[in-house]
């Protein structure tokens, strides 16, 4: 569909896509009061090593955003890698209190799934950020942050919106910040 705007023909965003994104965001927000959010915040407050896997494509943007937000939130031991061999080495040599975070829109990307399984087999804490759909990544993870997203393709190209995954990441970082402030306030009150 095209519409004429002051003499220029532009493509109008179909109402159905906007409504779909709105519904996905509203549904995703209902998932954010899970106990997993609290448990992940509690774990991160102990400042363990956090390993992020950045497999390629659009997921890299989400992983880079999470990495930046964790650094801003004063997590000092954050390690991002794009190489599966390097992450395998980290899995085999890391402390058992280490956290491995995997982001996947489908929860079925083979290299991500295999690394998450390997991390669990080595007794590591695995956190997944993935779609609410039944997916293998969520099943092997210790904790999950989930989102709604409808898969869209055009001639085989993935056009699935990543908006809800960013919404989950942003909401979690905000929650984590409030959680840490609550701990600081609690510690300050105890010292009086």
Please provide the spans of the model-predicted regions.
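Short, basic, glycine/proline-bearing loop/turn elements
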Residues: 22-27, 99-102
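Short, basic/glycine-rich phosphate-binding loops at helix/coil junctions
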Residues: 14-23, 65-70
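Glycine-rich phosphate-binding loops that contact phosphosugars or nucleotide phosphates
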Residues: 45-167, 171-180
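A short, well-structured juxtamembrane/interface segment
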Residues: 28-47
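Single conserved hydrophobic/aromatic residue that forms the stacking wall/gate
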Residues: 2-11
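Flexible, glycine/proline-enriched loop segments at strand-loop-helix junctions
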Residues: 27-28, 159
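Internal, active-site/partner-interface "lid" segment
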Residues: 136, 179-192
């Amino acid at each position: 569909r095209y519409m004429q705007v002051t003499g220029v023909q532009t493509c109008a965003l179909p109402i159905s896509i906007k409504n779909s994104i709105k519904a996905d965001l509203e549904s995703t927000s209902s998932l954010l009061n899970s106990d997993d959010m609290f448990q992940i915040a509690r774990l991160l407050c102990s400042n363990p090593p956090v390993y992020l896997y950045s497999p390629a494509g659009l997921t890299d943007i989400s992983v880079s955003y999470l990495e930046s937000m964790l650094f801003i939130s004063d997590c000092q031991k954050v390690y991002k890698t794009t190489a599966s061999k390097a992450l395998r080495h980290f899995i085999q040599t890391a402390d058992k209190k280490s956290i491995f975070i995997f982001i996947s829109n489908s929860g079925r990307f083979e290299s991500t799934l295999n690394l998450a399984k390997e991390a669990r087999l080595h007794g590591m804490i695995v956190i997944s950020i993935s779609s609410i759909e039944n997916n293998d990544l969520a099943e092997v993870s210790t904790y999950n942050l989930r989102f709604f997203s409808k898969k869209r393709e055009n001639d085989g190209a993935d056009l699935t919106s990543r908006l809800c995954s960013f919404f989950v990441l942003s909401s979690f970082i905000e929650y984590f910040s409030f959680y840490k402030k609550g701990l600081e306030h609690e510690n300050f009150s105890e010292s009086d």
